[in-house]
């Protein structure tokens, strides 16, 4: 990859997307499979001892080793790029040449709100990863609530801002990204409420297989969240993230190559 005159490092944006999508989805798959193979009885047990064949995400990623270490490492690694991407997407929306001039202050304000919600989502996810339900159930539950609420509001708001900015209509990729954002957000919202219902039903009636359905809905919610954020692949298609000098080369004076001796 060719670098500009003042570029020190240039990374294609698609690699950031692979990172924010590949690391958490791989972590989920690995942890669930390891839980099934190594700790099936413990990971799938329920408080009322009914039949269950899949571990919840909490049981799969935060209770047993090596699952909890794999989850924490991979989620921790992907948080950094997600923070960068959160700010980059804010700037992407605000710099659109097609955004409306009327209400520009309100538009910028909402872009900042969306960016803040995205950052909050990541911090709540990091807290969820660091503090398991077995260590502090109350704090873990609060972090989950914060993650879910900030995720839902961010998905809805950022999708609307993407359309309002004009980026949706700029290219065919923009339209595809918009459609995928709606799909990912819709699945996440449906899974959130369906998961809540199944969890309530399991705790109320203790029916066989209901907790398995709850686990499947949990997996779907996580994957739809990842899918939503991976739509950035289309938004930043062909772009790079570069580390560059804030001064042009013209600001540097070359040292002399020879030193003349006084005679």
Curated annotation (Swiss-Prot):
Membrane topology per the entry is: Multi-pass membrane protein
Q: Which organism is it from?
A: Caenorhabditis briggsae
An example GO CC term for this entry is:
endoplasmic reticulum membrane
**Keyword Membrane found:** yes
Cross-referenced PANTHER family: FGF RECEPTOR ACTIVATING PROTEIN 1 (PTHR12892), POST-GPI ATTACHMENT TO PROTEINS FACTOR 2 (PTHR12892:SF11)
Keywords of the record, alphabetical order, are: Endoplasmic reticulum, Golgi apparatus, GPI-anchor biosynthesis, Membrane, Transmembrane, Transmembrane helix
- What this chain does, per the record? Involved in the lipid remodeling steps of GPI-anchor maturation. Required for stable expression of GPI-anchored proteins at the cell surface.
Q: Where in the cell is it found?
A: Golgi apparatus membrane; Endoplasmic reticulum membrane
Family classification: Belongs to the PGAP2 family.
GO terms, biological process: GPI anchor biosynthetic process
Where does this protein chiefly localize? Golgi
Where do the TM regions start and end? Answer: 16-36, 69-89, 109-129, 143-163, 180-200, 208-228
Question: Which Pfam family is one of this chain's hits?
Answer: Frag1
Origin: domain of life: Eukaryota
Query: What is the name of this protein?
Result: Post-GPI attachment to proteins factor 2
């Amino acid at each position: 990859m060719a670098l500009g005159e003042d570029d020190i490092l240039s990374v294609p944006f698609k690699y950031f997307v692979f990172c924010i999508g590949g690391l958490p989805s791989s972590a989920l798959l690995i942890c669930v499979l390891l839980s099934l193979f190594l700790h099936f009885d413990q990971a799938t047990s329920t408080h009322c001892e009914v039949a269950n064949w899949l571990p919840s995400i909490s049981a799969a990623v935060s209770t047993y080793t090596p699952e909890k270490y794999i989850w924490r490492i991979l989620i921790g690694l992907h948080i950094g790029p997600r923070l960068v991407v959160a700010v980059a997407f804010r700037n992407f929306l605000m710099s659109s040449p097609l955004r409306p001039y009327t209400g520009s202050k309100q538009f910028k304000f909402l872009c900042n709100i969306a960016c803040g919600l995205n950052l909050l989502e990541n911090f709540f996810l990091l807290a969820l990863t660091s503090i398991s339900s077995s260590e502090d159930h109350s704090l873990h539950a609060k972090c989950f609530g914060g993650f879910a609420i900030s995720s839902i509001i961010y998905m809805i708001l950022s999708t609307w801002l993407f359309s309002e900015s004009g980026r949706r209509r700029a290219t065919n990729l923009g339209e595809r990204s918009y459609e995928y954002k709606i799909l990912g957000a819709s699945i996440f919202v449906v899974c959130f409420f369906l998961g809540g219902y199944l969890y309530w039903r399991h705790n109320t009636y203790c029916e066989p297989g209901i907790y398995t359905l709850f686990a499947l809905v949990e997996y779907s919610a996580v994957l739809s969240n990842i899918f939503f954020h991976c739509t950035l692949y289309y938004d930043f298609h062909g772009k790079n993230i570069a580390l560059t000098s804030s001064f042009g080369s013209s600001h540097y004076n070359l040292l002399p190559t020879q030193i003349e001796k006084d005679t």
